[in-house]
Amino acid sequence: MSKTDSSHPGRRQLLQAAGLGSLLAALPPARAAAPAESGDLLQAQSEVRLALLMGNSEYPAPFDLPPIPKNVHDLRYVLEQRGFVVSDALNGNLPASRKTLDDFIAKAAAAPADATLLFYFSGHGIQVDASNLLLPAGLDPSGKPDTLRGGSVKLIDDVILKIPPRKGGTIVAIVDACRTSLKAGADGGLNQVVAPADCLIAFSTGAGRPAVAPAVADRSTFYTASLVKLMESTSDQTQFRDLFQLVRTDVRETMLHHPVEAIRRLAQDSFIADSTRASCTLAPRGIATAAGPALPDAEQEEQDFQALTDAVWPADVVERADAFLKAHPKSAHAPAAMVAKNGGAEALKALRRREVRLFKTAFDLPAALATDEDMQRDLHRAGRGDKDAAARIAQIQRNRRDTANWMNRYEGWLQLASALGNGIASYDLALHYRSQNQPLLSSQWESRAREQGYTPPPSLDNVRK
């Protein structure tokens, strides 16, 4: 995590004074009444929610990160308001970090299958040999790769894959960590990942980019500040997956309009890997949201939102989302409509790129897959700019091989996923064209994958060439 330079007091003062952008100021408040006390909420809700927050600020000079305790403190408060039972740990060394993780994983294993589990890390993060490492307190981020590899927590192997899979539940992993190498010439940033089924992974910025941390203890990082603000203020009906898209937009716009040029130059565009299936709203299951006065157009509002929900083709998504926001600007569904509109616009832009050969007919569900809920879900999400959904559809097309144009559809969906920022899809295209004896295309797509911040594991990179 990059730290704003404390040797420039003017820059520090500007960063302290800057608030988050007002892009989402028009969204409706989370509740019509004050939130319930967290103890009352836990007694009333039917959904089990567990969270572990790990934050490390104490690293060898000059790598300390003063804002991390505030990050953890503020996020804990808002998560408890959202019905989570929260554990936190600050500045643990490697043994302490592993013990903390083991305790949380044991609690997760004992939780119901439909529980919501959340893991958050804020501190330094490094990529070594394509593996994403979370550095414990006291470990020098500029150390040798072998030292970092042996002295860190592996995000995927030690955290994500050890949390028991959910059936009807959701796992959320949030990493607000350094995204650029702290050694010249080393691999840059954390690596792109594929989230396991029923899991969402959010990084505070894209591969090869720094996540900015103030040099003072009374300011949060941009990403966590936005996450806390929007988790507290966004409507109860908002899905967690939509929340992270709202945070992504808010952080980017806030930093792009920051008065400090260096901050504008480092504007973060968070990475999100989403393989969730269950509905998971900010309000826990079993909690009735505070009802406002009955509105005369409530029935029409629900009909209009259903029409938006049913839309698949990106142009239809944008049109219906725009109409919904104009007709119902204060609706509790407004955050979801905003995410749909922005995502549909991204999908349309990607489909217009010259290298993407995918057409409207590809968004029509084949008869053989008419009852496939996963395929239906991914078609809807791809039409809203979901890079991971597009990549999953590509794999479905590849596995079918029972239609004359399966290969064209496979390539087209991977091309769309790549255009939406999926570096792993770009690398899959490189491998595909290599297998088709098209070395020029293979080289082009491999270069694209690396530009997007994806580093293939050494075994895959070396063996499959």
Task: Put a short name on every predicted segment.
Residues 55, 72, 79-80, 171-267:
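Active-site-proximal C-terminal subdomain of hydrolase catalytic domains
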Residues 330, 385-387, 400, 420-422, ...:
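Short helix-capping/linker turns of helical repeat alpha-solenoids
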